[in-house]
């Protein structure tokens, strides 16, 4: 794969990468960092991609790893409550999007990420298994349990 093909494929996957990163990190700045670092690493390791058909899956896995790297190395854990009014505003902005998205973002990551990858990004169960390094059965179970939790949380809302 040459530089031009790489650039085209990255541009095609950009929105998807952002949504996946956002489901893990929540902060736009951290998402941008994770995506930028992931793309750089992918370009540097392009020779390790065995099959061009799996480029997007491979790149998504790299970005997810970068998200986890940012979480591990974050030195600043600040509670929203320490900034009066800011926390409430941030939560209300998310809730204005839709109650379903709001509750989805509140799910535990091990349920949220497979649902985002499958329902929003359109990845197959097999691809999600490769990305998250899980069996297909485990992916199906997490999606099923995550949706059950969502239904339960949304019973009185929708």
PLM features: residue spans?
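Arg/Lys-rich amphipathic alpha helix in sigma70-family domain 2
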Residues: 50, 61-81, 145
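A short, charge-rich alpha-helical start-of-domain segment used by transcription regulators
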Residues: 1-19, 23, 32-35
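DNA-recognition helix of helix-turn-helix
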Residues: 64, 132-156
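Conserved RNAP core-binding helix
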Residues: 18, 28-45
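A short pre-motif secondary-structure segment
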Residues: 114-118
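Sigma70-family region 2
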Residues: 37-54, 73-74
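Residue-level preference for hydrophobic side chains embedded in well-ordered alpha helices
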Residues: 9, 13, 17, 38, ...
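Internal acidic/polar
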Residues: 69, 76-104, 124
């Amino acid at each position: 794969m040459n530089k031009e093909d790489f650039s085209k494929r990255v541009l095609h996957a950009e929105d998807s990468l952002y949504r996946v990163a956002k489901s893990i990190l929540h902060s736009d700045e951290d998402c941008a960092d994770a995506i930028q670092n992931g793309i750089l690493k992918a370009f540097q390791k392009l020779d390790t991609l065995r099959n061009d058909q799996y480029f997007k899956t491979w790149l998504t896995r790299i970005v997810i790893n970068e998200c986890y790297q940012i979480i591990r190395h974050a030195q600043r854990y600040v509670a929203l409550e320490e900034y009066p009014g800011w926390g409430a505003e941030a939560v209300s902005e998310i809730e204005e999007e839709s109650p379903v998205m709001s509750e989805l973002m509140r799910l535990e990551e091990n349920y949220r990420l497979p649902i985002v990858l499958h329902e929003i990004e359109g990845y197959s169960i097999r691809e999600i298994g490769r990305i998250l390094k899980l069996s297909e059965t485990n992916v199906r179970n997490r999606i099923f349990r995550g949706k059950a939790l969502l239904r339960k949380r949304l019973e009185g809302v929708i």
